[in-house]
From Swiss-Prot:
Main localization (coarse): secreted
Expression (tissue specificity): Expressed by the venom gland.
GO cellular component terms listed in the entry, alphabetical order: extracellular region
Domain notes: Comprises exclusively 4 tightly packed alpha helices (no beta strand is present).
Disulphide bridges, residue numbers: 23-53, 39-49, 42-62
GO molecular function: toxin activity
Organism: Eratigena agrestis
Keywords, sorted A to Z: Amidation, Disulfide bond, Secreted, Signal, Toxin
Additional remark text: Arose via modification of ancestral neuropeptide hormones (ion transport peptide/crustacean hyperglycemic hormones (ITP/CHH)).
Signal peptide as annotated in the record: 1-17
UniProt-recorded name of the protein: U1-agatoxin-Ta1c
């Protein structure tokens, strides 16, 4: 999984998961977009990137809070 994620991040221009402290900081930013929460434009690697992202419980909690 991590190898796939690294290949995705190195070879493709995708959006990847921010550190949870950045995510928390963005919770007060009305211009927040989900684009920064998940990988996008990674082709077949999107699912691997998302799985890596949401493995972090704090990050997941932030994502859920953003959905309201």
């Amino acid at each position: 999984m991590k190898l796939q994620l690294m290949i995705c991040l190195v070879l493709l221009p995708c959006f990847f998961c921010e550190p949870d402290e950045i995510c928390r900081a963005r919770m007060t930013n009305k211009e927040f977009t989900y684009k920064s929460n998940v990988c996008n434009g990674c082709g077949d690697q999107v699912a691997a990137c998302e799985a890596e992202c949401f493995r972090n419980d704090v990050y997941t909690a932030c994502h859920e809070a953003q959905k309201g």
